[in-house]
Structures are given as structure tokens and as C-alpha cells.
Amino acid sequence: MFGRFEAADPNELWVGDALHGPRVGDRKTYLFAFLDDHSRLVVGHRFGFAEDTVRLAAALKPALAARGVPASIYVDNGSAFVDAWLLRACAKLGIRLVHSAPGRPQGRGKIERFFRTVRGQFLVEVTDTTTEDLAAAGVDHTGALLELNRLFMAWVETEYHRRTHTETGQSPLERWDTGWDRLGHTPELPTAADLTEAFLWSEFRVVTKTATVSLHSNTYQVDPPWPGAAWSWCSPRSTCRPSRSATATRVSVPRHRTPSAAMPTRKPDPRPSRPRRQRRGSITWR
């Protein structure tokens, strides 16, 4: 018989996934978590109000800064995990990003078991709250979410990491430390500059014959002009970053919102509707 797969060393493989959490002020929460496959240590975690790449980064970036860079990260095909941003971040740090085959959850048993533990030992103690509950307690949504993350971190560090795991016979923290002692070195931590570079949002554009680049309906003038050259746009930095040194000047900004931002609804016209005659005597209202 073949036993279940397990990474031989710490930071050989991280497994990531998202879990639906409690309602905070009538808003749904999601837990992003990353588990070291060898030790079962929770290397990164964060509750957020959306299941997107922004909240994914909030869990992954501190994990890399504190626990080091893994050789591989194994995730499913959720929208946040297949985003090009995650692929770019992993490539910048030399991490192999692996997605499970659709409908085949093999290799995800450890993170799923951890989520069962979260439900049975942590979430059972957390009560859903409404907006009225937060108002009565004098807390806003941000403060309530921070408190949820604080409580979860305390549970992970004082309970989960120190309890003996039934499969390994060691606590996750003990197995993590023992693994590095056996390897004879500590985790390789990325520099702050490398992390910042890896987690930039990036878009590529080609310079037009008029020496401009366009991004989200905004036009930027390139100086010096390089028609046909490829430029990469990165955020949070507010500059265009080409493969060669130059600057880009914003010359036309008809749009002030990102494409994912919700557009305001149009107010109804207060003027009364008037009938408009069409052919064959029909009347429509506008």
C-alpha cells in the first residue's frame, strides 16, 4: 500500500485555500490560509470581506516575510488563485505555482482537515453579528474584522500550533523547528524589496506611433518616444516602468475608477416622461 503524500522538509510545499467565515456586521467573511505540508504549520492566514487577490495577498505576503519562501505552492482553481498577479508574484520569488486538476482534490486533504478543525474549534465560538450589533458595541466593520483576525491568530499560535497532531506525533511548531534543525539552517527569508517587487500589480502595454501608452482609458505620454516598445505598468507605484529607463506623463485621464470599482447608479430624471410618437401611430415613453 502507498501512504499519503507528505513533503519531506519544511517549506518544500505550501497548500493554500479559502474558507467561508462568519458574518461580521451582516457582511460575509472569507479566510485565506496557507499550510506547510510537512509540519502542518499555518504559515499564513487572514480573514477578509472578499475572496479576491487583495485579501489573498494580505495572507500570503506576511507569510513569506515571516516563514520564508517555499519551493512550491499548491492551490485550487478559484478565481483568486488563477489570477495572473499570483503567477507573477510566485515567478518573481522563484516559487513553483501548482493548481489542482478540476474535480480532483488530491493533495488537498491536509488543508481541508485544518479547515474542519477551524470550524469545530474556533468558528463554533464565533457568533455572527449584524450592523446593529456593531453599532451597539461602538465598533465599525474594520474594527470588528481586526478583532476577528486577532482572535484567530491567538488561537492558531496558542492552541493549534502547540497541540500534538495525530498523524505526525508532534505539534506543528515542534515539527517545523525539528525539520529546520535537521536541515542545518533556517528558512530563507526574502528581502523587503523583493517582496514589494513581487507583489506589485502589473500590466503590459505597447507604445504607439504617437509615443503614448494607454491603460484603463487613460493615456500617458512616453519620453523619450519608443514606438513599438513594451512597457509594464505596476501598482502601487504610480509610474510606468519600462524595461529601459524613461518616464511617462499622464496626458488624458477620462476615467478615475479602476475597472473593478462599482460605478454609481444614475439618479432618475425628475422631469415627467413625455410621449414620443412613432410610425403607425404607436407611442413609447422615455
Predicted region positions:
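Short small-residue beta-strand/loop micro-motif enriched in glycine and branched aliphatics
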Residues: R40-H45, V98-S100
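Mobile-element integrase/transposase regions
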Residues: M1-L35, L41, T53-P62, A66-A71, ...
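Mobile genetic element proteins and their domesticated derivatives, centered on retroelements
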Residues: D17, R40, L60, I73-D76, ...
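Short, solvent-exposed cationic patches
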Residues: K61-G78, S243-R244, R274-S282
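Protein C-terminal end segments and domain termini
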Residues: T208, T212-L215, T219-R286
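A short acidic/small-residue loop/turn micro-motif
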Residues: G48-D52, S260
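RNase H-like two-metal-ion nuclease catalytic core shared by retroviral integrases
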Residues: I73-L93, L97-L123, T129-A137, L146-L148
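Active-site-proximal acidic segments at structured loop/helix or strand boundaries
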Residues: Q121-Y220
